[in-house]
Amino acid sequence: MDFRIRVYNSLGRKLEEFGTVEPNLVKMYVCGPTVYDYVHIGHGRTFVVFDAISRYLRLRGYTVIRVQNITDIDDKIIKKSQEIGKDWNEIVDYFTKDYLDMLSQLKVKIDIHPRVTQHIREIIDFVQRLIDKGHAYVAPSGSVYFDVDTYPNYGELSNTKKEEWNQGEEFVKEKKHSYDFALWKAWKPGEPYWESPWGKGRPGWHIECSTMSTRYLGERFDIHGGGADLIFPHHENERAQTEALIGEKWVTYWVHSAFVTIRKEKMSKSLGNIIPLNEAIKKWGPSVLRYWYLTSHYRSPIDFSEEALEQAKSALQRIKDSMAIIRDVISEGPKFYVKDDDIKVYREILNNLNNFHTAMSNDFDTSTALSYIHEIVRLVFSTLQYSRDFLGAMLAFETLKQFNEVFGVMDEEFYPTYDKMYKIIDAVVDIRNQLRQMKLYEISDKIREELLKAGVRILDSKDKSTWRFE
């Protein structure tokens, strides 16, 4: 089987064989949110998609370092502060907490989480170096702009002509060209600011990610990701200013996830159809939401509807139900004989596992990979639950474990938390206490013996019983 990983590179718009700058190490930067409002289900898709990509690369033996920034100073934050009359720091802290809570619930792991306001010194240094190399200039207002004409490859990533970029008229007069973009924005009364060689001001949007990505991953790394809406102007401008500074290729693969639509319409405030991620998680649960995000290839739009989430919920429950059968068969132990039909099942399971990896290796195609997992689930219900074959159950268990390592929707099936374990033991001990009060000592003694075999010792007293691990 060919398990070489191929990735669709937005730069060049084609599939390319995956390779890393450093052996067995993947360095990945994904653009995070601007924390001026609740993150929504569109953000959630990006978080989960790149988490699944990271998980699969780890499953394949790579060490992955994933950086995802938090933009905590921006025009939108300042506007929100002025509209509601609250300090911008208060707004940032509140919505950062919501964002981090959503990541935790979705089981999305970020290795480094830099905030823009903690990297102002590095941003100023980055801008100054661009000025020194002739790629940026200081305007009379104290703003600093990137001179797009000094970077000949501008537009390659987004397939956009610089002359067609309409940024509005406010700052056009002080620019060399209308398509130049701000690296540093001069201070206006009532806005937060930091001191710089060019006067009071704050960073532009694009310079933040260039600075923080190179700060933590170096001047050459493997994957730069984000939503498709960031390709232009954000990622185009990031690439221009960074490659202008370092003088060579910056990122190997540009990877972008497609939009979430609501009944075929794009989410927008004007349509009033934006769904906060916290509301979706509250209604559907993080595992169902994760599963639903990954039912579609990350480069294809995914449409949100009640029906789609119900289908995802049912499909995930069927996988979990198959795990109950698998565990039950495994608990019975090996039978020490194998039938021809059992061997056929082994081959089917292994073929589907191989197909799962083939799909995931082909541009992280979670949708196709998922279809092979459901083939294994079908075998569990149609064959394994009747044959009670130990080895078949073990193979199915291992396959679903690898599936979960990527999809992250069944952790409780494979890695029960101590909290859940304690609750189960407490419940058993409480039932045993009630049996003792009913003088059903034979049953209560049997429970004590079985718990002891499992490493849990019951401590009986006159009024009640407690427990401890052996």
UniProtKB/Swiss-Prot annotation:
Its cofactor is Zn(2+). A motif ('HIGH' region) lies at residues 33-43. Keywords: Aminoacyl-tRNA synthetase, ATP-binding, Cytoplasm, Ligase, Metal-binding, Nucleotide-binding, Protein biosynthesis, Zinc. It is an enzyme of class 6 (ligase). It comes from the Archaea. Its EC number is 6.1.1.16. GO terms for cellular component: cytoplasm. GO terms for biological process: cysteinyl-tRNA aminoacylation. It is found in: Cytoplasm. It catalyses: tRNA(Cys) + L-cysteine + ATP = L-cysteinyl-tRNA(Cys) + AMP + diphosphate. It holds the Pfam family DALR_2. SUPFAM superfamilies: Anticodon-binding domain of a subclass of class I aminoacyl-tRNA synthetases (SSF47323), Nucleotidylyl transferase (SSF52374). InterPro entries: Cys-tRNA-ligase, Cys-tRNA-synt_Ia_DALR, Cys-tRNA/MSH_ligase, Rossmann-like_a/b/a_fold, tRNA-synt_1_cat_dom, tRNAsynth_Ia_anticodon-bd. Binds 1 zinc ion per subunit. GO terms for molecular function: ATP binding; cysteine-tRNA ligase activity; zinc ion binding. A motif ('KMSKS' region) lies at residues 266-270. Its main location: cytoplasm. Zn(2+) binds at C31, C209, H234, E238. ATP binds at K269. Belongs to the class-I aminoacyl-tRNA synthetase family. NCBIfam families: cysS. This is Cysteine--tRNA ligase. It comes from Saccharolobus solfataricus (strain ATCC 35092 / DSM 1617 / JCM 11322 / P2) (Sulfolobus solfataricus).
